[in-house]
Every structure is written in C-alpha cells, then in structure tokens.
C-alpha cells in the first residue's frame, strides 16, 4: 500500500523583548538560576500580571508579514496542567481568540512552489526549566525562563514530507529574524518546534492518528525525527496494528522517538479566560503604526536582488536567507561599485567558506563588508588575479590588515606589462622545444603546460587574459 504523510508544525518563537510578557523581570539568557524571576513569575499571591505592549507589537508585526488577520479583540486564557517548572499550576496562553489567524507562507522544495497555511499565532508565557544534572538524583528547577514571551505559530496540516517541514521551518526562522522579533537561536531554545505527524493511505481524505514529537531544536533533528516517526507508524499499520495518539520525544543519540505520555486534548487543559487580564483590544491605528515598521521581507528582497543585480534564483535565495547576509552583500556591492555577480561569488563562496570553517555567522566575520569590497575592487581592476585574491583573503582573515596593504607588502600585483610577459614566454618556449613541436603538430592540450610554466615563472602574478593572448600568438 502507498502511504501519504500529513504533518503540521507548532513553532515556539521566543520574542526578543527585554522583559517578560506579564512582568518586568529581564529575559537575558544564561543568568544564574532563579535570578531573573519576580513574584509574578513565581506565582506568588497578591500580584497581578500586566501585558507587555512590545510583545503585542511583535505578534502583530508577524501577523502582517504573513498576510494574516489581526484580531481586534483577543483573549488570554489559563491552560491548566501540573508540571514542576510551572509554578502557578497553569500557563497563560490564548485559546479560541488568538491575536493572529489565517496567514500563509510560501516555500520552495525541489523547484516546486508550495503555500503552507498558518492557522494561528498566539501569545503565551514560557514555563521554567527542569535541571536533572548535578543534583545527586534530584531535579532542580530554574524559573528564569518562566514568563518569557512566546509566539506559538501553528501551521495547517499542509506539509507532506520531512523535507517540506524543514523548508517551512527554515523560511519561518528567516522571517522572524528579518522582522527582528526573535533571535532564532535554536541552541538556547529561542526557536523550537513540535511536530504533529500522521500517515494515511494515499488518496484518503480522512486524517490518520497523529503523534506529537516535542521540543525539536535543530533543523536536522526535525528531519530525522519526522522520518523516523513516519517509518514507525507505517510499520505499525502494515503489521495490522493501530497507531495511538500520544506525545513522543526524539532521542538524537539513538535516532528514535519514544513515548512520553498519551496526547492531551484541549478539554484536558480546562481552558478558561484569565480573570486577571482584560481582553486585548488592538486598534486599526496600532496596526497601521506597526505596519509602518515592516522591513523589506525575504521574498520581496529575493525578487529585487534578481531584478536589480541580475542574480540567478539560487544566488538570490542564498544571499537573502538571512537579513544580515543580504545587508552584508549589498554593502559589498555598494563599496566595490563593481560587478554584482563577482561580489556575490566572493560573499557566497570564498567568505562563506571561511565562516563555515570557523563556525561563525556573517555577523561575526573577521572581514567586514568594506574590507571584502576593497579586495573585489582589486580583482575588478586587474591589480591581482582571482587566484592571488584568495591568498590575500586568507591573510586578511588570519592576520588582519587591508587588501591593499597585503598586496603591496607581499608584492602581489599582477604583471600587466606586455614586454615583461613576452620576455617570460620567450624563455619558456626556448626551454621547451620538444613540447613546442608537439603543440604545433596538433597537440593542443599542451597549451595548458605553457600557461602553467608561465604562471610558475611569474609566481602566479601574470595577468591571465594577457598571458593567454600573447602565448597563443607566440605558439603559432
């Protein structure tokens, strides 16, 4: 039997506010346990939550970016459940009246354009964190994270493979960073995913029984966990068994999912409106105010890069994958005042290679955009060849310094004097009469031999175009 996979993702994006969603406690990552939790976060009596306006602004900004409806009135609800790191015994979230509803996101998978529906995006507070190490068999509770603002983004069940799920998640990750509403740091838990996975016979419209895989915090783990879960469910069904609705956890070491608990339904949480918080009213004026702050979005920037700089689909996609990369590239083009394609190659290939080697993001590059632009200018004006430029780039990366200083100090300028190049060619031809005879007898591949000898003699500094042209004339 042929099976079809149905996937929906719930993505939790930690909003980049300075304080928590219902208190003034800070949200900085990495502080000593329980040093960033106030009475509200601890659930102590006699204190009331106050909604963070900036968190609302960020949620609205996201909604506008995905073409969603912004609710004029939305309601906060208490989601009741017990967990050691949930001090109040409930989580403040949104249920039937979320702030954002009915949006969409376009993705491209293997050249195929897909539109993924986004059911809703709602505001909620994060829970604390259970610490299981260094407590001699006990569990420690760190409530620094309790009350941190989250935007939970729930997709429609429109995804049909792990590959599509990862593409959607990457697109969403780029979007929240473009909007500057989330830093997207997956290692720190700022952007994490729950995946709802089910399978059904191909052609069937009724959904299969789903399992939810919790807290996936890397694109690689999302793909591996979903693929494993698909295989697990198909194996059960083909063996005559029945998939049960449950929550599962992905074990990255064993590359498997394991059961955590039976999957709760909404009524298990006994949602009801939070009596301590008034309904959230969002005016059209506030929406317009937020709309005015929207940056150029990834899809629009990609299309502009193709039109303005003549880039291919692939190049434009790579260079606009992050706002920081796009800004870096445009600065290089502007400072170099040169060929946008040449600039793209040096950003995407040479510089990115060094970044990947050292595990750095573009924001931590040892060579800034102006520095790379100065190197590109020297390639464009034929001061140095592309091969020499790679050596200069390595030196700039490892030792610092400007391209011009390194070129001057190491004597790397191209030899462009026609007389000097002709003299070197004459010496090489005189020293290799046998190869000359073979070339003139029709062995054209020996042309590369003469080029190599000339480059060796000039330590790679001969202008390649001039060298080729003069060499062809001399060898005739």
Swiss-Prot record:
Substrates-to-products reaction catalysed: L-glutamyl-tRNA(Gln) + L-glutamine + ATP + H2O = L-glutaminyl-tRNA(Gln) + L-glutamate + ADP + phosphate + H(+); L-aspartyl-tRNA(Asn) + L-glutamine + ATP + H2O = L-asparaginyl-tRNA(Asn) + L-glutamate + ADP + phosphate + 2 H(+)
Any Pfam family: GatB_N
EC number: 6.3.5.-
Gene Ontology molecular function terms on file: asparaginyl-tRNA synthase (glutamine-hydrolyzing) activity; ATP binding; glutaminyl-tRNA synthase (glutamine-hydrolyzing) activity
Keyword tags: ATP-binding, Ligase, Nucleotide-binding, Protein biosynthesis
One Gene Ontology term from the biological process aspect of the record: translation
PROSITE patterns the UniProt entry points to: GATB (PS01234)
Highest taxon above the source species: Bacteria
SMART domains: GatB_Yqey
Assigned protein family: Belongs to the GatB/GatE family. GatB subfamily.
Subunit structure: Heterotrimer of A, B and C subunits.
NCBIfam families linked to this entry: gatB, PRK05477.1-2, PRK05477.1-4, PRK05477.1-5
PANTHER family, per the entry: GLUTAMYL-TRNA GLN AMIDOTRANSFERASE SUBUNIT B MITOCHONDRIAL AND PROKARYOTIC PET112-RELATED, GLUTAMYL-TRNA(GLN) AMIDOTRANSFERASE SUBUNIT B, MITOCHONDRIAL
HAMAP family xref list: GatB
Function statement: Allows the formation of correctly charged Asn-tRNA(Asn) or Gln-tRNA(Gln) through the transamidation of misacylated Asp-tRNA(Asn) or Glu-tRNA(Gln) in organisms which lack either or both of asparaginyl-tRNA or glutaminyl-tRNA synthetases. The reaction takes place in the presence of glutamine and ATP through an activated phospho-Asp-tRNA(Asn) or phospho-Glu-tRNA(Gln).
Name of the molecule in the record: Aspartyl/glutamyl-tRNA(Asn/Gln) amidotransferase subunit B
Lineage, top ranks: Bacteria, Pseudomonadati, Pseudomonadota, Gammaproteobacteria, Methylococcales
Gene: gatB
């Amino acid at each position: 039997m042929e099976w079809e996979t149905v996937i929906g993702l719930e993505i939790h994006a930690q909003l980049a506010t300075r304080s928590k969603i219902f208190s003034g406690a800070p949200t900085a990552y990495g502080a000593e346990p329980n040093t960033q939790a106030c009475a509200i976060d601890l659930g102590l009596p006699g204190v009331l939550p106050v909604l963070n306006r900036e968190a609302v602004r960020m949620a609205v900004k996201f909604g506008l970016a995905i073409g969603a409806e912004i609710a004029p009135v939305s309601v906060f609800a208490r989601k009741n459940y017990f967990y050691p790191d949930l001090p109040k015994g409930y989580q403040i979230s949104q249920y039937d009246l979320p702030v954002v509803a009915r949006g969409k996101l376009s993705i491209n998978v293997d050249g195929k354009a897909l539109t993924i529906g986004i059911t809703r995006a709602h505001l909620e507070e994060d829970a604390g964190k259970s610490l299981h190490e260094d407590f001699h068999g006990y569990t420690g509770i760190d409530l620094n994270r309790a009350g941190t603002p989250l935007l939970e983004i729930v997709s429609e069940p429109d995804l049909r493979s792990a590959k599509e799920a990862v593409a959607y998640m990457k697109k969403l990750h780029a979007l929240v960073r473009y909007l500057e509403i989330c830093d997207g740091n997956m290692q720190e838990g700022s952007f994490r995913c729950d995946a709802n996975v089910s399978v059904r016979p191909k052609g069937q419209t009724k959904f299969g029984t789903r399992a939810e895989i919790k807290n996936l915090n890397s694109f690689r783990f999302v793909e591996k966990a979903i693929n494993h879960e698909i295989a697990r469910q198909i194996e059960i069904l083909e063996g005559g068994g029945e998939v049960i609705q449950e929550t599962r956890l992905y074990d990255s070491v064993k590359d498997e999912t394991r059961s955590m608990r039976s999957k709760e339904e909404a009524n298990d949480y006994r949602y009801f409106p939070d009596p301590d918080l008034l309904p959230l009213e969002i005016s059209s004026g506030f929406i317009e105010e937020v709309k005015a702050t929207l940056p150029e979005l990834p899809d629009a920037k990609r299309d502009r890069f193709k039109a303005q700089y003549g880039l291919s689909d692939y190049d434009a996609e790579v260079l606009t994958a992050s706002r920081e990369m796009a800004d870096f590239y445009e600065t290089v083009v502007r400072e170099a005042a040169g060929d946008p394609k040449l600039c793209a190659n040096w950003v995407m290939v040479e510089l990115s290679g060094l970044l990947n080697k050292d595990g750095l993001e573009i924001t931590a590059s040892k060579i800034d955009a102006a520095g790379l632009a100065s190197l590109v200018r020297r390639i464009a004006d034929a001061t140095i060849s592309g091969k020499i430029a790679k050596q200069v780039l390595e030196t700039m990366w490892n030792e610092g310094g400007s391209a011009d200083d390194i070129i001057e100090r190491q004597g790397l300028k191209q030899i462009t004097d026609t007389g000097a190049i002709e003299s070197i060619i004459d010496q090489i031809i005189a020293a290799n009469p046998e190869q000359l005879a073979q070339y003139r007898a029709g062995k054209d591949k020996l042309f590369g031999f003469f080029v190599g000898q000339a480059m060796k003699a000039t330590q790679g500094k001969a202008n390649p175009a001039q060298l080729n042209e003069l060499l062809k004339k001399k060898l005739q």
